[in-house]
């Protein structure tokens, strides 16, 4: 269902792009627009990950420089049968994370220092599982293509408007051409923006569900989303504000003013996502114990003692709701860090 909807929305964006090209230069303009889209997408396919990581000043880490964070990602990737992605840290106080890369073999995940400092190991695992789900679903490529096409539509729309519909004026239909230019300038970019946001919202729900399956506990991600949403919008993310086209990449919209689950939001409402994850937790009861190999009686409300290795030593507990905690009493065997060493300074 989600794949079909995404394919239909992408097809609509491509048709919209070609339509704007037709307004600019007739049938020739439509062909040129299609070729232009292909060129832009080819460039984005090979370079988008490098561009966005450089844009946010991300630095790569490994098992020596950030052992716990790296181990979480490695263990989750292995559980999802994915290649080991590159692991990055962004020096930003806003708790957030994203994934990028053209395919699972060339993927990367990035988490902010704010996220690593404020979340427990279990919550970080939930977030990273969500990002790995995006990689598994190839959402990173899908969103790159939609962002590229949306930007190209906006560019062509401006060009069509300033052309003033010249191809129609010679036939005494200047007004029709002007109307076409206005449509290209305002309606087409607006429609492309709505489609891009719709694709983003669709994929977030799918990544939440698959991420919960990867880590084995939907409540870890639900708790992480609650904390990120609670503190994220109080911290100004300068890079994201200057590059709003990348907002859809993050697990929570990094821009100020993100509100309800509407046509104009890049992400579903956090409350709706948490509710869906809680329902999934109920569905997974029993299956978690049978399939995940739980063997430690450590409640999720306890702090992850070795998670202070990540950065500053800040630690937080997970959900405080006793009814939620009591339903999930154990931590899976793969999430143990008793032998992790502190990162080298």
Swiss-Prot record:
It is a multi-pass membrane protein. Pfam families: Peptidase_M48. Belongs to the peptidase M48B family. GO terms for cellular component: plasma membrane. Binds 1 zinc ion per subunit. The chain crosses the membrane at residues 6-26, 27-47, 145-165, 179-199. Gene3D superfamilies: Metalloproteases ('zincins'), catalytic domain (3.30.2010.10). Keywords: Cell inner membrane, Cell membrane, Hydrolase, Membrane, Metal-binding, Metalloprotease, Protease, Transmembrane, Transmembrane helix, Zinc. It is found in: Cell inner membrane. Its main location: membrane. This is Protease HtpX homolog. The keyword tRNA-binding does not apply. It comes from the Bacteria. It comes from Bartonella henselae (strain ATCC 49882 / DSM 28221 / CCUG 30454 / Houston 1) (Rochalimaea henselae). It is an enzyme of class 3 (hydrolase). Its EC number is 3.4.24.-. Zn(2+) binds at residues 130, 134, 204.
